[in-house]
């Protein structure tokens, strides 16, 4: 398995968690901005990209602001900036019949499903969270 992030701080925390779980020999940690430093293919790609538009920063729940801004906010108006990139690029890093899975924000599922369909993904499934909000997208290439 490979774990990647653009944040050095996030990677250090991931490395500690991997070590504490006894998975150091099974998980490679890599600093990468999306797929920038990736040179292999996977059966599954899981992502929790930033999806809150920066314009909504003042109105979000206080609990959310404990995470670093880099992990939360996008510069575009709909919060879809990273999904567009991931959906387009992941096809090059997924094995045949591989899966892409990611968390999404409120009211983003329709656009994300359309992006997946437009980019040739199949078996698209949207999963709701405990509050019955569309929260996870799963798709197969």
Provide a role label for each language-model segment.
Residues 77-140:
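Conserved Class I SAM-dependent methyltransferase catalytic core
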Residues 22, 65-67, 132:
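Short, solvent-exposed coil/turn segments
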Residues 1-57, 85:
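Conserved SAM/SAH cofactor-binding pocket of Class I
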């Amino acid at each position: 398995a490979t774990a990647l992030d653009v944040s050095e701080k996030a990677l250090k925390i991931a490395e500690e968690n991997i070590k504490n779980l006894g998975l150091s020999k099974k998980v490679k940690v890599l600093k990468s901005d999306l797929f920038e430093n990736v040179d292999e293919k996977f059966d599954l790609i899981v992502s929790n990209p930033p999806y809150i538009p920066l314009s909504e920063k003042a109105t979000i729940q206080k609990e959310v602001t404990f995470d670093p801004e880099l992990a939360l906010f996008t510069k575009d108006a709909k919060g879809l900036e990273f999904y567009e990139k991931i959906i387009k690029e992941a096809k090059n890093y997924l094995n045949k019949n591989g899966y892409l899975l990611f968390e999404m924000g409120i009211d983003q599922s329709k656009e994300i499903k359309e992006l997946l369909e437009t980019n040739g993904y199949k078996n698209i499934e949207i999963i709701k969270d405990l509050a019955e909000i569309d929260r996870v997208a799963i798709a197969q290439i």
